[in-house]
Amino acid sequence: MAPTLSTTPETLLTTGWSDYALLDSGDGKKLERYGRHTVLRPEPQCFWRPRDPDAFGRADAVFDPEDEDEAGRWRFSGKPIDQFPLGWGDVRFHGKFTPFRHLAFFPEQAANWQWLDGRIRSLNKPKVLNLFGYTGVASLAAAAAGAEVTHVDASKKSVAWARDNAELSGMGGAPIRWIVDDARKYVAREVRRGSKYQGIILDPPKYGRGPTGEVWRLFEDMPALLKDCAALLDDDASFLLLNAYAARISGLSLAHLMAEATHDRGGRIDWGELALSEDAPLNGVDPRAIGLSFFARWSAK
């Protein structure tokens, strides 16, 4: 039986997180708070006016882009900062000022972490596969909720960082397998082995390279990978979550791809975008929200 495809998109907001806030936005930038640090980063879609322009000049860290591929440099108002601890629920991890304007995680993903937490806590020690796991926050959130996690990323450095975050969280002994591998190759081997999972998470980049030079292109490679992931879902599987950052994509297109991959599993497909919202009215202007990522998720019920 085909899954039921939601006819309306959802906008999922990151809320109630003491270690993160979107303070203001406008003039192609966003002002955020990470722990005790205020950070100003480019955000071209914020073409409205800031609510408090003077606050932009007081940021602790400012990212200056050098090219269209998001590379650039950080400026600091005081002593340069490399990394700093943050927390979300039971998970602890390091934010880091990377040369690619982000801080080694993506705060809008907290809406997905919250959803995963609820799904996993309703299950009995489910096996969860996290592909393109990066620095491991989603893997740690899943493990904290009770899952046995397999974390896969093509970058040895990212996997080492994820393991450091596990130690920081006091989860060094948690049931997490750390795998450095190309996601497509790993999933293909798992299909041949007959492995099964109750939940799978995918957060692929638009473009990337595997540990031995494999090239990943989202639009060319995602359909086959998602089909293989659907084959890894056990009979009692609970979810398959796909997230993507790409200008030429939409939540609806991801939903149709998900429907194709899960065509015989029943259940439901929800889709939409992840967004950050300014945390409160300021200077007479209500909070604005910034859509940053698209998602589609299949759930058994």
Regions found by a protein language model. Name each.
Residues 183-261:
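S-adenosylmethionine
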Residues 107-124:
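Conserved alpha-helix/loop element of class I SAM-dependent methyltransferases that forms part
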Residues 16-32, 39-107, 114:
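Non-catalytic substrate-recognition/targeting regions of SAM-dependent transferases
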Residues 124-134:
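Conserved class I S-adenosyl-L-methionine
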Residues 148-153:
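Conserved SAM-binding motif I beta-strand of class I
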Residues 237-301:
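C-terminal catalytic and target-recognition region of SAM-dependent MTase-like enzymes
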Residues 155-201:
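S-adenosyl-L-methionine
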Residues 135-147:
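Conserved SAM-binding loop of SAM-dependent methyltransferases across substrates and taxa
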